[in-house]
Amino acid sequence: MAAKDVQFGNEVRQKMVNGVNILANAVRVTLGPKGRNVVVDRAFGGPHITKDGVTVAKEIELKDKFENMGAQMVKEVASKTNDVAGDGTTTATVLAQSIVAEGIKAVTAGMNPTDLKRGIDKAVAALVEELKNIAKPCDTSKEIAQVGSISANSDEQVGAIIAEAMEKVGKEGVITVEDGKSLENELDVVEGMQFDRGYLSPYFINDAEKQIAGLDNPFVLLFDKKISNIRDLLPVLEQVAKASRPLLIIAEDVEGEALATLVVNNIRGVLKTVAVKAPGFGDRRKAMLQDIAILTGAVVISEEVGLSLEKATLDDLGQAKRIEIGKENTTVIDGFGDAAQIEARVAEIRQQIETATSDYDKEKLQERVAKLAGGVAVIKVGAATEVEMKEKKDRVEDALHATRAAVEEGVVAGGGVALLRARAALENLHTGNADQDAGVQIVLRAVESPLRQIVANAGGEPSVVVNKVLEGKGNYGYNAGSGEYGDMIGMGVLDPAKVTRSALQHAASIAGLMLTTDCMIAEIPEEKPAVPDMGGMGGMGGMM
């Protein structure tokens, strides 16, 4: 086991604070509408330019082990805030730096670190309650666009495209961000349920221009095994043919004689059919087949529940207004499923999201909810170069998370104003313990730091602006983008309450732990012996 370097007291705390400051100073320059970019070197490819706090934080590793521990703890603030709210990482880092700086002074002056932490925790709890009280619901497209553009560093185009996407797929719908092919941002909306399986044979195509198979008012047959024998299918095919309507078959696979017969019938015009594979694998496939069944009003024909393909009737088939099958995707538009059953299914999947542990599972479950509830929107980010696209994509993803958070818990005045107004909750907060009261005062001063940093990044004088904002009431604040004072919500400078709350809670949590640290242990790196020279090889010269 390698030897350890153990350090105590103020000396080690100072090293930890140095690490906090290095990371926080790199992150804080990105805050606000006039925040600067940070350029990050990459091992492969060009440098990465970003204004996203958590991206900057994740890149920082320091040489000194003790400084690095401080930096890593603040990195945790940024990534935790990002996980919970999706934005507000820079605000959280600035708050953590401020609480640590003020708190270390108090600890050095001889105050009890544990009582300071308790005071900080009580102050934060009071601020969070006050933020909930002053939050306003975020319902309109205009407000959603404003939140999006503020989060994307005052890029109004980004806010507008996110608001449009939310309007089209609903607040529950899935919105994904992809690389675009042009210079402009584009929005692509898939209405209805889409899954990533296409036709099993190109002979099913009936729209040569779009290269898709389009079925109007079709029946939908769902089967959870392979179909290779056409005899199993004949009874149901005859019933569909009598009804003179097309048929979509979704099964584990359709192959051999069965597929050949369907193709021949399709080409001759006897019966318009299309066969596709069922989406997903294993248990996820069963669940998705059940989703499609509920959406279209079908029954999944499965031997597990005693149903067989030969005995299937039209009552077991689902229906939809239109289904489009491409080479790689199938889209079901306006399924005939029962609305109450669809809602119950969505509620059931939401319950699974609550209990899911892995991010992958959660993401897949959320996709299923969106497909049942609304649809899927894809924002394609356009840019002139790859470096610009990465930077823009970071901002669009941040803005998307911020708008979701705003819809969830409402909005508060942006630009650091909400935290200043929430301070009113601390004015009458007395703990009956001098050191805990000092902890409350630390938070009271720290909540000014985001506004101070926004003003500093915009080239203003922080103290002058903070005093002027404190003289005002309600949503009165300073718009660093335009240099004006006024009603922040009226000017469209909004922050999601969830983002502000998460930033404050995570910053205080880690900062409190740092203040109560009195010993740090790091591994002493082993000195590697020098590589010996190639002695005795001198005579090689004569071999030429």
UniProtKB/Swiss-Prot annotation:
CDD domains: GroEL. GO terms for molecular function: ATP binding; ATP-dependent protein folding chaperone; isomerase activity; unfolded protein binding. GO terms for biological process: protein refolding. GO terms for cellular component: cell outer membrane; cytoplasm. Induction: By iron limitation, glucose deprivation, and growth under low oxygen supply. It catalyses: ATP + H2O + a folded polypeptide = ADP + phosphate + an unfolded polypeptide. Changing residue 437 to E: In strain: PID 2. Transmembrane segments: none annotated. InterPro entries: Chaperonin_Cpn60_CS, Cpn60/GroEL, Cpn60/GroEL/TCP-1, GroEL-like_apical_dom_sf, GROEL-like_equatorial_sf, TCP-1-like_intermed_sf. ATP binds at residues 30-33, 51, 87-91, 415, 495. It is a peripheral membrane protein. Its EC number is 5.6.1.7. Pfam families: Cpn60_TCP1 (PF00118). Keywords: ATP-binding, Cell outer membrane, Chaperone, Isomerase, Membrane, Nucleotide-binding. It is found in: Cell outer membrane. Belongs to the chaperonin (HSP60) family. Together with its co-chaperonin GroES, plays an essential role in assisting protein folding. The GroEL-GroES system forms a nano-cage that allows encapsulation of the non-native substrate proteins and provides a physical environment optimized to promote and accelerate protein folding. Forms a cylinder of 14 subunits composed of two heptameric rings stacked back-to-back. Interacts with the co-chaperonin GroES. This protein shows ATPase activity. This is Chaperonin GroEL. It comes from Neisseria gonorrhoeae. The gene is groEL.
